[in-house]
Amino acid sequence: MELRRVVVTGLGALTPIGNTKDEYWEALVSGKSGAGPITYFDAEKFKTKFACELKNFEPTKFIDRKLVNRMDRFTQYAMVASDEAILDAKLDLNVVDKLRVGVIWGAGIGGLETFQDEVLNFAAGDGTPRFNPFFIPKMIADIAPGNISIKHGFMGPNYTTVSACASSANAMIDALNYIRLGYCDVIVTGGSEAAVTKAGMGGFNAMHALSTRNESPETASRPFDATRDGFVLGEGAGAIILEDYEHAKARGAKIYAEVLGGGLSSDAYHMTAPHPDGIGVIAVMKNCLDNAGLKPEDVDHINTHGTSTPLGDVAELKAITEVFGEHAKNININSTKSMTGHLLGAAGAVESIAAILAMEHGIVPPTINHSVVDENIDAQLNLTLNKAQKRDVRVAMSNTFGFGGHNACVLFKKLD
């Protein structure tokens, strides 16, 4: 069976540094940080008092007020980003066969704020069970793609992948394979997350995962820097329209890139820590290259998982050196989490959009906030430090890893 070619025809982004894909890109290349003091709740008693929140986001500008009240923020974000991507793809909803259009989404946690608030309300009462009737449908992780499909009438495959921070990359790989195998013509894919809540901040603080650089939030996310002390929690959504190449060509769609392949692996090592030698990361990148039919020397750019954690950054770069050998020093490596923070289940989608736009514009966004060299990192690697670099990117890789040892990797290629 001959596999169909799959391309990207639409992008949508709602991030801490920009509420559209164009705003997001402009902020990326200018090296803008999205971190600042938490405004959603009083964080004075928390170890970490800052995060990468969305700015100036008003859901009722995009979604009916009645529906907003029935959606957790992670679903609101999904609706807005997917609408932008569908419009960007110029998909004619009156013409497309909706039975062959799916929605495959990623969310690592889902409706955390809804769960938190309902439980707190119950705990504050006398034990009488008084719950919002929308508690469950607001909270469950699969509800975001459900709402997207209901709005647009898409009747193809519809579900959420949950693999912590690898969730939206897993969703993209599933979407890629459904189209490759001929089961769908178009899939709305991506991911969303809204974990900047008391429970989210408190939980990650309890496991010592977050930076506590409260005196300087904007510089706290510093991947690959020797003084990094944890990630900065972010939120938002990224949406990508994947489409059969012939279907896209027939309707005259703009094509951003071809999706050449995806790879998956497991660390099988520790619940939250990476293998120190990056064994699972080595496997996932090799799997992705094999799936795409590429050689290591074909890759020009890697948007790393790069969370700004002491263990994770070193393990990933060790793995890159192992997989790419001498060619590793020729690759523009970066971590856009230095600007957006860590969007958890939405990270894979948002960072894939950054890699795709790097190909389109011929510019690789920087890894900001780097000032102290880490002696455990190969000095020959080009980590695109502090300033964007011009680069003719033909092939870009996006790495995403999640708690539980989940590893996902996607490869994109500029269309010839």
Which positions does each model-derived feature cover?
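Condensing-enzyme catalytic core mediating Claisen C-C bond formation in acyl metabolism
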Residues: R5-T9, G36, E215-A292, H301
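Glycine-/small-residue-rich "gating" segment that lines the acyl/pantetheine channel
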Residues: G125-N132, I173, N177, E193-A250, ...
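Acyl-CoA/ACP chain-elongation machinery
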Residues: Y183-D229, G262-P276, G306-D313, N330-L381
